Amino acid sequence: MAGLESKVSDMKIKSDVVFYIDEASGNDETGNGSQTSPFKTAIHALETDANCTIFVKKNGSEEFEPITTNALKKAKKGVEQAAKKKAKAAEAEAAAAARAAAAKEAEAKRLEAAKNIVLKEPKDAPAAKKIAIIDSTNFRDSRVRVNGWVHRMRTQKGIIFIILRDGTGFLQCVLSGKVYDRASYDFINLGPESTVCLYGVIKELPEGKSAPGNHELVVDYYQILHAAPTGEEAFTNRLNAEAEPSYLLDQRHLVIRGETASSVLKVRARALRAMRDTFENLKMTEVTPPCMVQTQVEGGATLFKFNYYGQDAYLTQSSQLYLEAALPALGSVYTIQESFRAEKSLTRRHLSEFTHVEFELPFVNFGEFLEIIEEFICQTIDRLLDDPIATPLIKQLNPDFVKPSRPFMRLSYEDAIKYLNEHNILTPEGEQHKFGDDIAEAAERKMTDQINRPIFLTYFPLEIKSFYMKRVVDRPELTESVDCLMPNVGEIVGGSMRISDIQELLAAYKREGIDPAPYYWFTEQRKYGTTEHGGCGLGLERFLAWLCDRYTVRECCLFPRFTERCTP
């Protein structure tokens, strides 16, 4: 240290300021130029004080030495270059600020002029016909008016492009010229999801350009019906791809406006229509059974119980019993309505309220029953793939969808147990499957995905199935029951032949500990003209999850209901 002090005193110091530079460990940002907190560069030292005295510790050196003449010249040159660069940057920044100010002033003047433009519907134009976007192709080169929500909007070189949505489709709308001039003021505070009425002529797009429907509306007049908020409250700030699933469920009323969610709901609507058309073709009659009941179908553990004028009642688990009652009156019957299950499991395949597509068939045996289920599924899919509305949506949602090949694979429960064990697909407890196991969802799906084709899983043990299922004549420990399994989703249909003998049904009540009194009307179906009959139920949301390649059935209904979720 004494040697360093001697060097300092021996130098011809121009300033009282002395800075220390450590090329290895110094820091221009956090250092203060002292020996204990040195700078990194001589340039920074000179920028701090141009007349300072500088000592430098080179890489690998243990001592601070006076800066060499060449190093000092180089540092001073670096300071000069940095100063020029900084001055040039400041000049450029000032010029940019001046241009921005001029542009802002010009834009303010333009907007003020736009504000004073009075836009009127063209007097010499034909009357605009109100249409839905889905009908746009039929009105090309015609003047129309279209109401809708602003799905997206952008401005480019004096043109405003709007993608308008009305629930039936999307339409590109173009505002230019005088219409743009006025709209450029009116639309400043027009956020996504604003509602507007746009007037103009629908023009087919030239080759090389694209838009929904391959046409666009050239707007000549508009009306703003309601301006949705911008800024922090803008619709686009309410939803984002990284949002938690629970938040998206809270915002489901907004989520369904998105292209994917609305596409699923449109396919759902077309699927319901296709199913009804298929039922009509199969000569089945639609009925509407009650949703408030005093009987159970699938066991008491999943019943929603409520007080019905002082009596215990339940939300229906299934309309099966009522469909059976309708057989002698109407023949083959079906219903499409909600069923309710107090499911405790939070899986992606379960809902507490779901749309249940059920049908019952008289005078059939088990083989015929399976054939009709297969026919119903395949005919419904064929109708959807021929539907001009559903087909493009299905291709958009599930590009790799292939309609199921027929016949569906028949796989008995006992053979399924063998398959699971042979392929080392274990129970949730990590054990091999055995007869009597209720095959878990994960194992069932893994097997189905490996086989990769529709499966009729048949002949389940009596002990794991419902009381009303018919036993196999020569194997009374088995039932004439079936689950239809689809790759990537698992079970979508469950059904069985029903007990047709009154004594067998009474024995089933006793075996399951069920009081037969509330079921008197169901029992009497076996008293007055019984017959072999079967029926099944299809979960619409599971069917859609398979068809539209959705991860969870919660995406396949308007507002899903499941454990702890009953809003919005």
UniProtKB/Swiss-Prot annotation:
Q: Which GO terms describe its molecular function?
A: asparagine-tRNA ligase activity; ATP binding; nucleic acid binding
Q: Does the keyword Protein biosynthesis apply?
A: yes
Which keywords, in A-to-Z order, does the entry hold? Aminoacyl-tRNA synthetase, ATP-binding, Cytoplasm, Ligase, Nucleotide-binding, Protein biosynthesis
Quote the subcellular location field of this record. Cytoplasm
Q: For this protein, what is the EC number?
A: 6.1.1.22
Principal localization reads cytoplasm
Cellular component GO terms held in the UniProt record = cytoplasm; cytosol
Whether Cell membrane counts among this entry's keywords is no
Q: Which GO biological process entries does UniProt record here?
A: asparaginyl-tRNA aminoacylation; cytoplasmic translation
Residues of the signal peptide: none
Reactions the enzyme catalyzes:
tRNA(Asn) + L-asparagine + ATP = L-asparaginyl-tRNA(Asn) + AMP + diphosphate + H(+)
Q: What does this protein do?
A: Cytosolic asparaginyl-tRNA synthetase which catalyzes the specific attachment of asparagine to its cognate tRNA.
Q: Which family does it belong to?
A: Belongs to the class-II aminoacyl-tRNA synthetase family.
Q: Could you identify this protein by its name?
A: Probable asparagine--tRNA ligase, cytoplasmic
**In the UniProt record, what gene is named as encoding this protein?**
nrs1
